[in-house]
Structures are given as structure tokens and as C-alpha cells.
Amino acid sequence: QIDTDWKLGFVGRNGRGKTTFLNLLLGKYEYSGKILSSVQFDYFPYPVSDKNRITEDILQEVCPLAEEWELMRELSYLDVDVDVLWRPFETLSNGEQTKVLLAALFLNEGHFLLIDEPTNHLDAKARKSVATYLKKKKGFILVSHDRRFLDDCVDHILSINRANIEVQSGNFSSWMSNFERQQEFELALNERLQKDIRRLQQSAKRAAVWSERVE
């Protein structure tokens, strides 16, 4: 069970099914069982079909109920000049495109964001700006290979493991510390079991030899 106020970092090795999981939430795949949700899921990056259009027109498509002043407020939080609203979307830098789409998606009340690798086209300054912005928001799942970025803006970690999916409170560093501790415990347990197996095998051999001698 996931609280819709959480800021969730989503981690797991490549190929473990992170993208598949997001697509299940978005209703793109058929599945057995039930996914119960009180919110609508939105995906980032939002697909912009015609980048020649004016940015404000695109953002009104993303968040049709938002007022212009609300967009301007969100852009100010992300250190983006509001004049981007009246420029063709394709003239914005990759970082500006990332920021304006995130700002618009967060204006959809009652929606839960699935944010997939938002830092791919961001420089260090823009990453810090987006991390600060996300830290003040709530209600999202964030997929990122940037560990520092995850540490800066999440309060829970959702992890896909070999045998299960689990949720832990904390940021990426605390999750990694717990994960490594668990790995060390399992390794030590396995080594102890192997020693016990070898000891029992040796005992069985000695018993067999003793039995043969008695006979």
C-alpha cells in the first residue's frame, strides 16, 4: 500500500520491471488482480506531439484547469523566466522543457505523478533546482539513476528486488545501507549453512566408515 502523499524513489536493477510497473499503473497493459487507486496517474516526460506550438498552449493541454498565474508561480519556483510561456516549445532548452512540463503536471490536483528520469538533460544547477522543487511537492514516484538527486527529494523508497517489491521509509542512502546490511546477513547465513552441510556430510562419512569396520 502506497500513501498518495509520499515522495517515492523507485529503484531496481535494469530489466527488473520498473517501466513495466509504471505502465501497469498507467493502464497500458492487461493484468490479473486489482490495482486500487484514489488518484489518476500522470507520466513524465509528457509526450509533446507538435513542438512548434506556443509553450503556454501546450501547458494548457497538460493542465487545462490551471490559471496562467499558477503556471507563472510554479515556473518561478523552478528558476524559469516566465517569458518561455509565449515562445515556441522547440526553442526552449532541454532543461526548460523539463521544468515547464513538470510544473504543469503538478498543477493537476488529485493526480499522482510517475516521473521517469527527469535529470537526463539537466546540468548541475538545474538538477539542484528541480530537486528543491520536488522536495516541496508530494504525491509522486521518481525513477532516477542519480543517487544524490534521489537523496535530495524523496522520503520513501520503492524497490524491486529479486523475489519481491518492498517500500521503506527514508531516502536512497538509508535504503542502500539497509540493503547492504541485509546482503551481508544473507551471505553470512549462507556461509554458515554451507559449513553445517559440510560438517554433516563429514559426520555421515565417518559414521559409514565406523559401520563398515564394525561389520
Label every model-predicted segment.
Residues 1-191:
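ABC ATP-binding cassette signature C-motif
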